[in-house]
């Protein structure tokens, strides 16, 4: 079966003809560029001045720029210290037993003490258990049970939402908000118009003047959570977000410190698009079930909580083995000797683990970490360290896709080329096993487009050219790297990607375009000042200001942030829109990669400055076990 493709590959006999027309000329050009840096198995050539400077003179006399980046934070001792005690048979058997007991909860969902469950709370009970399983990170064991529960809830869904139970006379904010959020995330067509029933005569959302009960607070909390799953044009969801944000912030000032207050704080802090599932599970484990007063609910909560803790800790044993494999690849590829670039392979692996922690998705996690590390190395090479002539040569050699052609490259580029070549080919073999077809041609096309976009930006930097916003934006959606970070990793998964599905997930799909857009725009808002200090003037902010003379930097940032808000809603729609041909499960991991990158840019450039929030993420989700 042919793969979707949008551009022909450069053939071996036609190597970037605008630059070089033959291997002889390729080698001739290479002689004008001094060898420097490091070969894959050679020695590094260290800059003659400190990494803290943005400009260095290397031993060959070439003046180069370097980023002021801190070193790798995670040595072998840290990796070896990862806990593995929970892979013992007794823990695995206990987890299996609990999975069976939770399934029994679903099977007896219609009964309470042998009687039919009250028609006044059967809907909220189903929503509660589904929501709890998802937030605790253990829902993968209960796919059939979750579908049955949500089918039941949806069968009672009305134009005003639902009450707590199937025979409730009055619709309930908590049930309706949680219902809309949960049903929408599972692809059920539910309208946000249900929230009109919770507005006052003045057209505004309203609650009691003085915050009264935990039940009321939880209803508004779920309204806030639902508002973040907004689609384009849903004005009422914007209103719900504004109202609920204000309400919850005021509630935090009035209620005592409790599991509910901590839950509110976490949800306000991370929202949805930057609340990575494993981080949410880690946080929710700490607050889940503590406010439960009902004895039966307490027993249910206790079982869910124990299973969540076991699953969290058991996964860490697998993480250790995968990290050992990743670090081995990093060392064997010669990366420790590459002094010009950032080393964030452990951080990228952590992001992958936070969005895909099913045991069978090892290929995705390792593939994502390796690809993102390569992206970072290339980013630092194209943006700062390499000269334009060297980069033109590297770009042409990449398109040749022939390791015998690397003799013409500077020494430091040889290691980079071989690492890309070997890793892309390795992932293509894994993808062929998973998909039953060759995907290398498709991967190469994606990498060519990516390298070309980097080369364009390198020319802009070298010439001081500031493009228009549209020119920058279109190129930047490619150079951000989202497409190549997602493409090969998702193809290694146990999810079929025939052509009609792949074209809705990868380029030129709207989902891919919006995911790339959010990474480019959010990245620019966090990086543009540091980039500008290194001589990289082009950003969405500066290009927008160029196109709109007189606009201040603050106004430009406001405009970009408004664009991001619109992009997020569009991305929600592309993921969750009703589509019988492309299931949500096929799009979810590409979507979650956008969430992972968005998290890294939540406070700052978390990939350059990885010793604050990003370090905390590694510690909380990778290094620390949850006490049982």
UniProtKB/Swiss-Prot annotation:
Presequence positions on this chain: 1-36
Subcellular localization: Plastid, Chloroplast
GO MF, one annotated term: pinene synthase activity
Positions of Mg(2+) 2 binding: 379, 383
Gene3D superfamilies per the UniProt record, alphabetical: Farnesyl Diphosphate Synthase (1.10.600.10), Terpene synthase, N-terminal domain (1.50.10.130)
Assigned EC number: 4.2.3.119, 4.2.3.120
Residue ranges annotated as motif DDXXD motif: 379-383
Major place of residence: plastid
Keyword Manganese carried by entry: yes
UniProt induction comment: By wounding.
Cofactor: Mg(2+); Mn(2+); K(+)
One BP term from GO: diterpenoid biosynthetic process
Record note on cofactor: Binds 3 Mg(2+) or Mn(2+) ions per subunit.
Protein's pathway: Terpene metabolism; oleoresin biosynthesis
The reaction(s) this protein catalyses: (2E)-geranyl diphosphate = (1S,5S)-alpha-pinene + diphosphate; (2E)-geranyl diphosphate = (1S,5S)-beta-pinene + diphosphate
Pfam families linked to this entry: Terpene_synth (PF01397), Terpene_synth_C (PF03936)
Binding site for Mg(2+) 3: 531
UniProt miscellaneous comment: The conserved 64-Arg-Arg-65 motif may play a role in the isomerization step of the terpenoid cyclization reaction sequence.
Purpose: Involved in defensive oleoresin formation in conifers in response to insect attack or other injury. Involved in monoterpene (C10) olefins biosynthesis. A mixture of alpha- and beta-pinene is produced by this enzyme.
Record text about domains: The Asp-Asp-Xaa-Xaa-Asp/Glu (DDXXD/E) motif is important for the catalytic activity, presumably through binding to Mg(2+).
Protein family (similarity comment): Belongs to the terpene synthase family. Tpsd subfamily.
The protein's name: Pinene synthase, chloroplastic
Species this chain originates from: Abies grandis
Gene: ag3
